[in-house]
Amino acid sequence: MRLHAFTLLSLLGLVPSFAAASLSGSVGPLTSASAKAAKKTCNVLDYGAKADKKTDLGPPLAAAFAACKSGGLVYIPAGNYAMSTWVKLANGKAWALQIDGVIYRTGTDGGNMIMIEHTSDFELYSSTSSGAMQGLGYELHAANNWSGPRLLRLWDVSDFSVHDLILVDSPSFHFSIDTCSNGEVYNMAIRGGNHGGLDGVDVWSTNIWIHDVEVTNKDECVTVKSPAKNILVENIYCNLSGGCGMGSLGADTDISDITYKNIYTWNSNQMMMIKSNGGSGTVSNVVLENFIGHGNAYSLDIDSYWSSMSAVSGDGVELSNITIKNWKGTEANGAQRGPIKIICPDKVPCYNILIEDFAMWTETGSKQWYSCQSAYGSGFCLKSGSHHTSYAVTTTTVSSAPSGYSAAKMPLDLSTDFGSTQSIPIPTIPTSFYPGATPYSALMSKQSTKAAKARAVDMSVETPAAASRSEQVVQGASQETSQPAPESAGPVRSVPTGGNRPSRHRHGHHHFWIAA
């Protein structure tokens, strides 16, 4: 019998019901990267790659994958690599891709620089937490070319993780998770240009856990698209970004059981937006909890008549069972754009919308408004009642700050954007993504350092022969070229004190994480 962590923990009363409903089962690869590497390691340098920032990495990467696709680890050592032809790595099983170098886009085709498809039991990571894809999108954007490639796309991938990776300046979207299942994405930094169409993370999949990710761009931060079910998004740092959202939503929308938790949004377009214009289908069972915002144009923005998208045939997307809880901070100008805007379709009004513990205040002026249309539930401008008929926009204006709106800021909040026509530097992955929240997993670079130190301590009590072998292992793990450090990889990482976590696969078995 297959058990799931959330089912067990919720029965024990250890996980809130909304969290238990977010994911439907375990996430992550079935086997560790170290086990994959032990079976076979395919170093791209052995297949013709050169870290000279000139030789095309595409063919060597494809060749290394072909050799390891049935089980093994494809290894890109530290160094600078050029990539002018894109790769589609399909039909792999029980394999991992370790990117410790920096891949620079040198080609101009559209599509996806790296696409993983029809794959199971997969892990993509950097053991140094500094591996990156540098899209150099500014080179195309300066010529008003916005049709360049995406950096990374996963399609039809199950039981996977992507972590400790940096994505920079994509010509188009940065990271798309398309029709995947049982996945985990974490410890990432994404930095794009200040222009629309340069999405951070887009996900339309089932049973996905995205956490501890920083995004800088002008469009989507971490956005759920249709169809999607059982998505948990938490500890997200939208650092001068477009902000998180759902949509754009069109015909036959099918989104349910979505949780956004611990979302920090700085100087962005919105804290959360659900956007549509016509269409059909449903969005249901959504929790938006623990949001902090500062300097954003919009805060909560549900707009079923969003004018920036062309109208879609249909009466509108039905929104129901949405909880907005514990929002704090400030918006840029509450008189121009109030912190609560819930505009629902007149033909299919929203219902069971709950707003509680919501305290935002304007940074400019001394008043703000709340606006609702055809929206039912509890809190602020929402109407109560079980008969959900349409009604015109109602707006409430207030001129005094709510109590408890003050909220912490992050020390790495950016003061300026990176434009879209100049080079964007490769950042480091932060170690904090939401005020007061400890990331679920330490960066792999820090884990490797701790492992090496522990190994060095153990050497002092080993026999001389064993100590010699241990020293060789430590030295090999610290090298940045020629050999991977598989002992630092794998689906099992440290558990922070004081919180519950979803279940990850552990060496082919389901492991139930219970916080100390």
Curated annotation (Swiss-Prot):
Keywords: Carbohydrate metabolism, Cell wall biogenesis/degradation, Disulfide bond, Glycoprotein, Glycosidase, Hydrolase, Polysaccharide degradation, Secreted, Signal. One of its GO terms (molecular function) is rhamnogalacturonan alpha-L-rhamnopyranosyl-(1->4)-alpha-D-galactopyranosyluronide lyase activity. Residues 1-21 form the signal peptide. Residues 469-485 have a biased composition (Polar residues). GO terms for cellular component: extracellular region. The active site is at 219 (proton donor), 294. It catalyses: Endohydrolysis of alpha-D-GalA-(1->2)-alpha-L-Rha glycosidic bond in the rhamnogalacturonan I backbone with initial inversion of anomeric configuration releasing oligosaccharides with beta-D-GalA at the reducing end. Disulfide bonds join 42-68, 221-238, 344-350, 372-381. Its EC number is 3.2.1.171. Pectinolytic enzymes consist of four classes of enzymes: pectine lyase, polygalacturonase, pectin methylesterase and rhamnogalacturonase. Hydrolyzes alpha-D-galacturonopyranosyl-(1,2)-alpha-L-rhamnopyranosyl linkages in the backbone of the hairy regions of pectins. This is Probable rhamnogalacturonase B. It comes from Neosartorya fischeri (strain ATCC 1020 / DSM 3700 / CBS 544.65 / FGSC A1164 / JCM 1740 / NRRL 181 / WB 181) (Aspergillus fischerianus). The lineage of its organism: Eukaryota, Fungi, Dikarya, Ascomycota, Pezizomycotina.
